[in-house]
Amino acid sequence: MKLADFDFDLPEEAIALRPANPRDAARLLLVEPGQDFRDLAVRDLPGLLRAGDVLVLNDTRVIPARLKGVRTREGSRVAVEATLHQRKAGHVWTAFMRPGKRLAPGDRVSFGETDDRACFLGALDATVKEKGEGGEVTLAFDLSGPDLDAAIAERGAMPLPPYIAAKRAEDEQDRADYQTVYAEEDGSVAAPTAGLHFTPELLARLAQAGVTTERVTLHVGAGTFLPVKTEDISEHRMHAEWGEVDAATADRLNAARAAGGRIVCVGTTSLRLLESAAGEDGVVRPFRDETAIFITPGYRFRAADGLMTNFHLPKSTLFMLVCAFAGTDTMRAAYRHAIETGYRFYSYGDSSLLWRA
C-alpha cells in the first residue's frame, strides 16, 4: 500500500485549538458496518453500549515533556528545545531535539537555566550520550529519580501536538485540558486523546448502564507525532512505547468477552496495547513490555470489538489504523462526512465510535 492511499484534504480550520467544554459535549460520529453514519455527542455513549460491555481506558499521565535549554560546547552556546520521548533509566531519556544538527555526543545541555521556578533543585543539566536519526538523542541527566521528575515538572511545558503548537502557545489551561480525568501513571509525552472526552459524571452514567471500565497503561511517545516518510507504508517503522496489561485485567477482559460483552478500546493507544497483549486465539495475556505494533489494512484484529477515537491527520499511522479497523472505504467516507458537517479534528477535536468491520 502507498502513503498516498491515506491522503485526504483537511481544511486548516477543521483542527481544534481548544477542547469542547464540558468535555462530553464533543460530537461523536457513530460508524457501524453497513449502516448510515449517525451524528451524536459523546454524552450519548451510555445509550450506544449495553450491559456487559467493557471500555478499556489508558490511565497514563502526560508529563510536561517539552524543555527549552542551551547547548554548551567549548564556550559556544546554542538555544535548543527537547521533547522527551521515552525513559530508559532513572536518569536517562531519549528525546527529539531541535536543532538536531547542532548536537553531538558529549555536548552539555542546561534546561530552563533562566527559569528560577526549580532553583531549589539546582540546574537541570544533561549530557548528550548518543545521537540517532531524525533529531533523536539520548540524554543522561545529572539528576535522577524523583528529583529529576520534579525538575521536569517545574520547568517543562505540556507537549502540545505540532499542528496545535504551531498556531498558539501552550498555557496553564492545557495542563488540565491535555490530561484525562482518570490519568494516574506518569510517563506519556502525548495524551491518549479519545479519553479527554470523559467526565466523572459520564463515567458514573456508564457504570449505571452496566458498562464496566478496565485500565491499562501505555506511555505514549513523541514518535506518535512523526510523519510517515516512506511512500511504501510497509517500510515505515514505529517507535517503541512501553505498556502494561496486568494479569487481573487480562482475566476480566477475557471473562467479559466470553460472556458476550464487547471490548471497546478508548483510543488507539489502548487498542494497540490490547492487540499486542492478545494471542492469535484472541485471548488477552499479561503484558509488560515495549510495543512497536503498526496496524494497517489487512491486519486481523484479535481483542477489540469497538474503538472510540478522535479524527486523525491525513497520511498518519492512526488514520491507517482506523481504516484497518472499520474499512478503508468506510473511513474515507466517514471523514468526508465529518469534514462536510463541521467535525473538529485532532487531539482537542471531536470523536467517533467505530464498530469493527
From Swiss-Prot:
Main location: cytoplasm
Source organism superkingdom: Bacteria
Pathway field: tRNA modification; tRNA-queuosine biosynthesis
GO cellular component labels: cytoplasm
Enzyme superclass (EC): transferase
Single Gene Ontology MF annotation: S-adenosylmethionine:tRNA ribosyltransferase-isomerase activity
Catalytic activity: 7-aminomethyl-7-carbaguanosine(34) in tRNA + S-adenosyl-L-methionine = epoxyqueuosine(34) in tRNA + adenine + L-methionine + 2 H(+)
EC number: 2.4.99.17
Keywords of this entry: Cytoplasm, Queuosine biosynthesis, S-adenosyl-L-methionine, Transferase
Location within or outside the cell: Cytoplasm
Any one Pfam family match given in the protein's UniProt record, by short name: Queuosine_synth
InterPro entries tied to this protein: QueA (IPR003699), QueA_dom1 (IPR042118), QueA_dom2 (IPR042119), QueA_sf (IPR036100)
An individual GO BP term: queuosine biosynthetic process
NCBIfam families: PRK00147.1 (NF001140), queA (TIGR00113)
Similarity comment: family membership: Belongs to the QueA family.
Function: Transfers and isomerizes the ribose moiety from AdoMet to the 7-aminomethyl group of 7-deazaguanine (preQ1-tRNA) to give epoxyqueuosine (oQ-tRNA).
Subunit structure: Monomer.
Protein name: S-adenosylmethionine:tRNA ribosyltransferase-isomerase
Organism for this UniProt entry: Phenylobacterium zucineum (strain HLK1)
